[in-house]
């Protein structure tokens, strides 16, 4: 029991350290894409910049709006970072925290709970900008979870279950990225929207909503939202690697190296998209999901069901 707690604690600490360096990589990559250097003052090559930013935020005085609900105001960022870390329990890592038979269902359940942290933060701030940003974030997140859920069902038809280890075994010969490329493209775009990344970062919308649902947060509470957002980005890309790009189960070291390299490649694509595309209009964002992704995903799902019935191959664990 104690060893499990220590293992979980160390895993969460490593995730937060990875998130810290992810922010540095983002600033560096965007800097070079815009023909500038990025952070290069604090430490060698700017490697200590994330820690300097974290210390700066956490030593700031915590301020709350005078009419805010203090309990919910503090609960919202704590809930956000807690859910972002709990999601990692389901991943089939070399030193996995648990062995889940319904890992994908667990991910859907926990990610849907993150909506409450967004809505609570906007409502507890007692600010119209924060509330409007929270409502946008909730509508966007719920909308894209519909297609993400249907894509997961389409993938489980091939794997035969919701256990993530089944996907690793399934992709020993060929990645699902190739036969399922339409679903992969929609999945990648949906993860951009699910994590509120550009060009779907309408929840922040500086030109319209000042800063979105976290406009009233500062110091350590804002840092918790920031850590939760980047932990979710890291997790969604890791999940994409497991679902579509497979990994070898030859050894733990090879698995870790392979998964890290593929995850970093997907994160680079996230940053490339951010540097290349302007923000969508909100109605375009909703039309993309409800009028494009949803019908296509349903059609592919029905096609896969019909093919499995036609050839008499029915997954045993669905």
From Swiss-Prot:
GO biological process per UniProt: aerobic respiration
Top-level taxon of origin: Eukaryota
Keyword Transmembrane: yes
InterPro entries hit by this protein: NADH_UbQ_OxRdtase_su1/FPO, NADH_UbQ_OxRdtase_su1_CS
Record keyword Transferase present: no
One cellular-component annotation, GO: mitochondrial inner membrane
E.C. designation(s): 7.1.1.2
Location(s) in or outside the cell: Mitochondrion inner membrane
Family: Belongs to the complex I subunit 1 family.
UniProt name for this protein: NADH-ubiquinone oxidoreductase chain 1
Species: Myxine glutinosa (Atlantic hagfish)
Designated gene of the protein: MT-ND1
